[in-house]
């Protein structure tokens, strides 16, 4: 699936989902699934990634704020295996018996 690398924003970021499903994960293991109309708030300094699902597209508008002329710090890439594992875990936790 298409996703960002891990990154942080010194002044935060808002993700506005416009189509499909968007996954957002943080370094502490929290994964959110957002759908059209949802807004995901990424607080300043929180290490995170975001992207589409494994078998479906997702689109979002990212609104990023600046602090001292800087809006993002890019970090390490999220490997395909790690991404797949995180998205599958998030999907599994949302299933209803």
Predicted regions and their residues:
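Conserved short histidine dyad/triad with adjacent acidic residue
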Residues: 1-9, 44
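Conserved strand-loop elements at the edges of beta-sheets that form or border functional pockets
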Residues: 8, 16, 34-36, 52
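Residues that flank catalytic or metal-binding motifs in active/ligand-binding sites
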Residues: 10-13, 46, 56
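Acidic beta-to-alpha connecting loop that harbors the catalytic carboxylate
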Residues: 21, 46-47
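Short acidic-glycine-tyrosine-enriched beta hairpin
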Residues: 28-45
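Double-stranded beta-helix
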Residues: 49-97
């Amino acid at each position: 699936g298409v996703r960002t690398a891990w990154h942080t924003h010194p002044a935060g970021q808002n993700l506005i989902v416009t189509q499909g499903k968007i996954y957002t994960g943080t370094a502490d293991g929290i994964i959110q699934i957002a759908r059209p109309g949802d807004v995901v708030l990424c607080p300043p300094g929180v290490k995170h990634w975001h992207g589409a699902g494994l078998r479906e597209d997702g689109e979002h508008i990212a609104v990023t704020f600046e602090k001292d002329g800087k809006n993002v710090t890019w970090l390490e890439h999220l490997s395909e295996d790690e991404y797949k594992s995180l998205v599958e875990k998030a999907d599994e936790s949302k299933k209803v018996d």
